[in-house]
Amino acid sequence: MSGVSRRTFIKTGAAAAAFAMAQDSSRDNHTPVQPLTAKGGGIDVHHHFRPPIPGAVGDPKWTPQMSLEAMDKFNIGAALLSLTMQREQFYAGTPEARALIRTCNDFGAKCVQANPKRLGLLAGLPFADVDGSLKEIEYAYDTLKCDGIGIYSSTGDKWPGDPFFDPIMQELNRRKAPVLIHAAVPNCCNRGFPPGISTGELDFDETRCAQSLLVNGVLTKYPDIKFIIFHGGGVLPVMAGRIKDRYPNDRKQWIPNGVWAEFRKLYYEIAHGSWRQNLLALKEFADPSRVLFGTDFTPEAIETTLRELPNAPYTLAELQAIERDNAEKLFPRFKL
């Protein structure tokens, strides 16, 4: 290297990297978090409640009032409540799992009934149990008046696009259901990772789920389901090109307009995925009208998502739509 020793270059580069990391850490820890700016407040499509059941996940002190106070603090006008990480209990395929889901949905519906202008319900399903899921969809929509459905990205050795689940998809399509897909570490890749390592598997499994919907024709056969992929699409925005190039030749009937057109039917919420580099990839991949606001509260602090939004690569009009307007189209009862 001309004029600079290799050792000096490495030391200088390391120092610069350390400084950049320190600056980033300082910003993360100390930058004031601003409320959303959307008129009427944002709509949070990824917001968890903690049901009164054994092993419930989330803040043990959670109440609807806790959510409402946090929402008021950050100008969030409405939140769609869904279940969080208890897939093994809910997807056991047993009568007990059906009863557990029913208890959770009844509790979530009571929270909504007490705060109908602020809260909505994405009802859970005993998804591994097809007949139980069909009964729960009927109950959740016709009795509880839910706003949509929440499912997990995989169960056992199956992902939601598997033909085994077609009867469920047919009914969700008939209902024109918004469906939030919450990731879980799949059985195939749950290797007892040390703390912090399994986090990536959530995003990888969300991407496997999207592939499953694609190659099994769910996105084509059931176009009225509004699937919502969490955390900005997982790793899908950066993997989609490889997925496109490796699409099976014997399944071309499911991509009449190509792979990109199918993936662009999906919606993408940005809870804990609002870093600029993530959103740059998402903006190239998905139309801004398909991007939704979410927080992953209570497992994740609302500040985690809001802190990064000032750096988002969207115009003010696009951010307004992401914060509220896009979700109003999926959940019209919250329309101003």
Please report, for each region that a protein language model flagged, where it lies by residue:
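Acidic-and-aromatic substrate-binding clefts and catalytic sites of carbohydrate-active enzymes
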Residues: 56-62, 89, 127-133, 156-163, ...
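Aromatic-lined glycan-binding groove of carbohydrate-active enzymes
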Residues: 223-259
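Mid-to-C-terminal alpha-helical segments outside catalytic/metal-binding sites
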Residues: 2-41, 45, 54-78, 106-114, ...
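Active-site gating/metal-coordination segments in enzymes
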Residues: 77, 83-209, 216
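Short acidic/histidine-rich active-site segments
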Residues: 182-183, 227-238, 269-271, 285-304
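Short, glycine/acidic-enriched loop or turn micro-motifs at the edges of active sites
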Residues: 47-49, 185, 299
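Hydrophobic faces of well-ordered beta-strands that scaffold small-molecule active sites
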Residues: 43-47, 79-81, 121-123, 149-151, ...
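Aromatic-anchored helix/helix-loop segment that forms the rim or "lid"
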Residues: 251-280
